[in-house]
Amino acid sequence: APATTTAPATTTAPATTTTTTEPPDPRFTFEPVEGVPGVDDEEIAFAVIGIRTLNPLGTCILDCYLDGIEAYFAFRNGEGGLFGRELSVGYVLDDELFSNQVRALEVISADNVFGVFNATLIANGWGDLNDNGIPTFAWNIHATESANRTNIFGHIATLCATCTQRAVPYTVKLAGATKVASLGYGVSENSKVCTRSVADSIDLYSSDIGAEMAYFNDSMGYGLPNGIAPEVTQMKELGVDFISTCMDLNAMKTLAQELARQGMGDVVLYHPNTYNHPFVAEAGDLFDGDFVTPQFMPFEADAGNTMQTAFIDTMAELGRDLSELAMVGWINADAAYTAILSAGPVFDRKSAIDALNSQTAYDAGGLIVPIDWSRQHVTPVEGDATNDYALECFAPVRMSGGALETVADPATPWFCWDNTTLDWAEPSQTVFGD
């Protein structure tokens, strides 16, 4: 018989391996940039201008603001920086209350930083920075100085100082109050305008909230050097049970102490500037039941926000205290980062400014109410949302035993209204960002 042959063994083709390569993160793409002030192959440098010396409020402004900026830069640099460069503070200038313009002109003359951060009480240098095309990121408590200046980016957009708002009236309703007082300083035009705006807001929504204006005084002495006993007596006689002021936190303490002295400790106060945890803690139960509204998501919120977590964690890593001005600095630094990132790896001052001005819903990662920078440099007018926020929102917290807690659900800390109408309505609770 013929020999048989064995069929050759079959072999299995080797498995092919597919390797997926993630595209590089565009944030870290380095491209040469020449002729841009404050930018070299290693860093993007900024100046910080603010008030430290001669601060009449006695509060931490410049240094706390700087804490937030430096924390944000540390956070981003820890990720790898931006376009192959580290973000840095080149130098810090104390404007000593009256020298903001002098410091701005020094920065303009030196021409050695990319942009400027600004936290001051007298913003007379903002116009010079704007007119010289320098990206400026600011603690925007100055509606007039920020208006119509498209190179100035506040932690909030340009506001209408004289317009009515629903925040204080809604807080009056929450407090169950019926007789409202509005107080402000006579020496400060901003304070006087604020005081009138609050009164107008109560008048507008009086029938909706079941409360009315009972006392108005926009001529208080700055810092209440003579106390406030006569005014408190008048308010007591008028049955005032809710007081909104446009005064600083020290004056609020003086007011609260006098109310307690005259047996009016249960009167609810609406504070404009007392989102200051050490100050509130030191006051103990003096401010129990009072309200204050930060202009960003409160630290007390529990919304799972990535940027809020990054802020709190980075501040802790650096050994810095949480503060209102630190968060403002963080938000301003995020705007600067966003401007450059949006401009792309080959950038300059103008392209960064233009890129940020094209953002129609900038919210600093959900920390603030979304801003449309394509239109919100222009001062809004009453009843017209063309240049205003799409939503009117506030995120109040209430004081108790020296601590603070959100009024809304901590997961949705903002109360918001449709801003296309002035009609009264119950607000919706919401959260922004992620």
Regions found by a protein language model. Name each.
Residues A1-P23:
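Extracellular mucin-like PTS domains
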Residues F28-E70, V92-F98, Y185-C194, L322-M327:
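Extracytoplasmic "Venus flytrap"
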Residues P32, C60-E70, G78-R149, N217-A229, ...:
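Beta-alpha junction/loop-to-helix N-cap segments that form part of ligand/metal-binding clefts
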Residues I51, A74, D334-S342:
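Short glycine/serine- and small hydrophobic-enriched flexible loop segments
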Residues I108-T120, F137-W139, K179-G184, L238-L249, ...:
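Periplasmic-binding protein-like
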Residues T150-G263, A301-D302, T306:
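Extracellular/periplasmic Venus flytrap/periplasmic-binding protein
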Residues A157-T158, E258-W330, P413, W417, ...:
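Extracellular/periplasmic periplasmic-binding protein-like sensory domains
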Residues E317-A326, T338-V407:
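Segments of small-molecule ligand-sensing domains
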